[in-house]
Amino acid sequence: MYDIKKWRHIFKLDPAKHISDDDLDAICMSQTDAIMIGGTDDVTEDNVIHLMSKIRRYPLPLVLEISNIESVMPGFDFYFVPTVLNSTDVAFHNGTLLEALKTYGHSIDFEEVIFEGYVVCNADSKVAKHTKANTDLTTEDLEAYAQMVNHMYRLPVMYIEYSGIYGDVSKVQAVSEHLTETQLFYGGGISSEQQATEMAAIADTIIVGDIIYKDIKKALKTVKIKESSK
């Protein structure tokens, strides 16, 4: 079993987006700590299987971040289950999870399931609209969410998601200071080695996604943060 606490860098691939075989090979051979498959819309069983089958040729951890029950399947090392803490719709807190457990609970290996306390921060993102997230958050709001995740829910991961834009470093720093046990994931807008370095100095793990489809060379440079220590 892999130890996710040692992961500093994850590449996140959207099964609904095209990636060439050469670019996928470069991503999987880049020394990233893991590959995560996940997206907001058009995530289907077919496109998840298609992408998973290509990545499985490489010897690195593979994660499915669950966005709908229909695309859940065996064959992944971990299943990351988001609970969107700032969603106004209970379905994105635990409603989808409830349905999944009713259907698959008898066959789940819970050692492979990681519960993520998600906070969505970009109002213009697809994920914010889809999850009906309240993104009008102060630093104090985020600190309270961090305390909730770390001390009360005791979740293994808190994921600060800016999805498409580079986040407010001071707010991410404030969250980090309140997490003593929970691992901090940051994702959103990382498009350069400099941004990756800046966020990796605060978060335990950075998630790099969109830039893969815009500039593969810049995406690959973000892996260099593994050479530094947090």
UniProtKB/Swiss-Prot annotation:
User: How is this protein organized at the quaternary level?
Assistant: Homodimer.
- Please list the reactions this protein catalyses: sn-glycerol 1-phosphate + all-trans-heptaprenyl diphosphate = 3-heptaprenyl-sn-glycero-1-phosphate + diphosphate
InterPro entries, per the entry: GGGP/HepGP_synthase_I, GGGP/HepGP_synthase_sf, GGGP_HepGP_synthase
Q: What SUPFAM superfamilies does this protein's entry cite?
A: FMN-linked oxidoreductases
Protein name per Swiss-Prot or TrEMBL: Heptaprenylglyceryl phosphate synthase
* Enzyme Commission number(s): 2.5.1.n9
- Species: Staphylococcus aureus (strain Mu3 / ATCC 700698)
Record has Cell inner membrane as a keyword: no
